[in-house]
């Protein structure tokens, strides 16, 4: 059933239908489209467009259709309709005849699809919030059972300073908390109702738009009809949040891939989230993490595609905007998948605490501590930094750790160095001395972990 055929003498070509028809993907919006139509039927009944009997017939048919939609029982594949809107309307007309032909009075597909899409996006924001919180809970849980593990911290992928493993976990918790904040912020801007905006200029019928908005769970109606049907900022915002969060997951995946490598060997991943090689029997590959990292680019692409699509569009609706859906559907689906597999990966992690500690002691990670020791003895930091660097060079040439150098060897560089330097150079001292808010000392880490546990329990 065409919604716009009266002005045309010829039908659409098969190729045009291939380009134009959106039912193959916007069928995802079936439940939202039907809920919007239920609200619209009530609104036009109050406006006098439908009598009581007509409204009752429509509402009963729509509610029955909604049950089928929610159960996944609608037969889209047998339909030749253009989009989800014509599919629903054609189904109603088949059941009710001319009564169903009144449903679209005062409404355009422009405000209809904008409403459907906002409803769908709002629902998925709520699901994504749950998924992000689940990853946070997994990280917090893994940190909690590994409080005493110390491993190297890196800059430039070179060992820099030792950190507690929970401190590493909580770094990603902070990133994911920002993702949650962005999702909540987005929802506040998203939650306005376009229905009643018509094609672009509003409707001539006395529709109570505030009542429609409240019925559909929106905070308010959109206040400008042109903007209401043209706006896809909420799609772009969700794609941006998805891209940012996927970037966080990708960085975490990269860390864990390295930690899991034979070169580091800090962690082992469970069999359930790894795979083998068809040729090399010994391999246990971190494929879940690699796919998480790889899917990041796919989500980035959806954001870039819609930005480019929207940048040159005049007001109001243009068919280019039909390209908003597949990218968001795919990006949010990939994000859902990656968040859920991230939980499984984190839950599977087993740490080799001895190997972590050994690596943390290597690489002269205590060189900064030596410089700080010299500062405590009254030497200016820049001078102390230079002295510590020369001590590292000497230790490298002698193939020793700094703490393995004798007092005589150390005093070559500064007379203030005494036996009390050796405790300062020990791993636990290096970590616990950073006992400041946000640091990797035991006290701030345990406080941060306790706060996270209170907010994000499994």
UniProtKB/Swiss-Prot annotation:
Zinc-finger keyword on record: no
Major subcellular location class: cytoplasm
Q: Which residues cross the membrane?
A: none
Cytoplasm keyword on record:
yes
Q: Which GO terms describe its molecular function?
A: argininosuccinate lyase activity
Listed under GO cellular component are:
cytosol
Q: Which GO terms describe its biological process?
A: arginine biosynthetic process via ornithine; L-arginine biosynthetic process
What keywords appear on the UniProt entry?
Amino-acid biosynthesis, Arginine biosynthesis, Cytoplasm, Lyase
> What is this enzyme's EC?
4.3.2.1
Which CDD domains does this entry report, sorted A to Z?
Argininosuccinate_lyase (cd01359)
Q: Which reaction does it catalyse?
A: 2-(N(omega)-L-arginino)succinate = fumarate + L-arginine
> Can you tell me which family this protein belongs to?
Belongs to the lyase 1 family. Argininosuccinate lyase subfamily.
Q: What is this protein called?
A: Argininosuccinate lyase
The root-end lineage is: Bacteria, Pseudomonadati, Pseudomonadota, Gammaproteobacteria, Alteromonadales
